[in-house]
Structures are given as C-alpha cells and as structure tokens.
Amino acid sequence: MPALVFIDGNELRAQEIRRILPGIPLAVEALQTGFSTSAPEPAQRARDKVLAHPVAAGCFAEAVDLTTLDGKSLRLELDSENENRFCKWWRETPARLHLVVALRRAPGAEIELVTGVCEGRIADQPAGPHVLGWDRLFVPAPDGAAGEGDKGDEEGDDGITLAQ
C-alpha cells in the first residue's frame, strides 16, 4: 500500500495520527512555502491545504476550530499571547471543537470531507509541551464526542474524526 501523505509538516502531529491509524503507511510533507488561507470555516481551510499541495499520491489535511456553543469563534482569542486568555469567563464557557479532515484518495480525485465535533470547555491552563494544538487548550466533556466510537486516554479529541 502506498503511503498516504499528511500535509502538515509537524512530526509530533504525525506521530499522533500514526497511533490513531495503525497499519496505514503515512508520509508527512510540509505545507508549501507561503501557503495561506483566510477561509473562516475549517472545512474550507482543510480543502485549501489539499488543493494547494502538489502530491502524486493520496493525501489529507486537517483544520480545527474552537467555538462557543452559540458559534462564536475562540480561535483568535485563544491563539494570542494575551495573558488573560484563560480567565474564569473562558474556563466556564462551554466550548465546541470542530475538526475537519479533507481527503483526496488519489491524484485528481474529488476531495472528501470528514467532520467531527466534541463539546467541552477551555482548560485552566495549557497542557504540557508534548500535547499539540487545541488539545492543549480544550477539555472534552465526558460524553462530548459527536462521532463514532469512544476515544482512549491516549487519543486526542480528533482521533474519532481521523479514524472515520
């Protein structure tokens, strides 16, 4: 089976994906130099990554957004260096993590989108240095996953979506 190309360039993230998808050969390639997308929706951001990356194999990319339950994006507020970003108001505000994976099974094939949603809250402080992205900031509710299957203790909030 040829390797599936993960368009990201983050080897720690690739290790997480290899753990979630054992047995699937995975190659990691960085996003193109200068790549940028201003798409507000994670589905379009993930699709843009796949469309912008010239690969001669099946490939996928992911995009994540974190919102309040009424849809207000927390991405910019929590991604900043603002020291108040973990204030009590944020910690007590219910949040929803959206993950979209854009998959192109072969060169020229249509792009498929798989979406996962998990409800929870913002962490009191970021998790340690070996936890990536939103997993550092988001604490899932015990029954917060809106996808197939249950995630294990070692699996990130996005493991359900990737496994689909």
What are these language model-derived features?
Residues P2-V5, E11-Q164:
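Anionic-ligand binding patches
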